[in-house]
């Protein structure tokens, strides 16, 4: 578990190559770097398919949205994926207004996001592209 003054990140691994990162608190200019770092480390360590469980998020600004897009790109570069789950109404509205929900799949719950993850056959065992 990682602590920052405005964010707590909790990780679980429901399956090989998949991680759920629960985000509690506020995603802002101060806490976004911790989220980015933790997500990218999970991907590097062999979980290229990542679900961000946003249900406990109290606040998110443009730094948080930018971080989510950066994580998506990082995951895709490593044959992975990013899904968002459980976004509270204030965050779901922000994702909709900005169009981020068209870039990153969003689901009502982490369980639904996990059910939609497809690990492609023939994907490299390693998470880094050559």
Predicted regions and their residues:
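A charged, well-structured terminal subsegment
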Residues: 108-130
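General small-molecule cofactor/ligand-binding pocket signal
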Residues: 12, 85, 107
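Long, contiguous secondary-structure blocks with strong helical propensity
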Residues: 17, 81, 118-120
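Short secondary-structure boundary/capping segments
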Residues: 1, 10-12, 74, 96
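STAS-typified acidic loop motif
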Residues: 3-37
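Short, low-complexity, intrinsically disordered N-terminal peptides in bacterial proteins
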Residues: 1-6, 126-130
């Amino acid at each position: 578990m990682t602590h920052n003054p405005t964010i707590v990140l909790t990780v679980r691994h429901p399956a090989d190559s998949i991680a759920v990162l629960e985000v509690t608190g506020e995603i802002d200019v101060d806490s976004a770097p911790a989220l980015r770092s933790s997500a990218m480390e999970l991907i590097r360590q062999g979980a290229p398919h990542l679900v961000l469980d946003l249900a406990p998020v109290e606040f998110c600004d443009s730094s948080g949205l930018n971080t989510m897009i950066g994580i998506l790109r990082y995951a895709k570069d490593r044959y992975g994926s990013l899904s968002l789950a459980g976004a509270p109404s204030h965050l779901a509205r922000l994702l909709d207004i900005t169009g981020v929900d068209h870039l990153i799949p969003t689901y009502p719950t982490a369980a639904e996001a996990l059910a939609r993850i497809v690990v492609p056959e023939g994907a490299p065992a390693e998470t880094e592209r050559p």
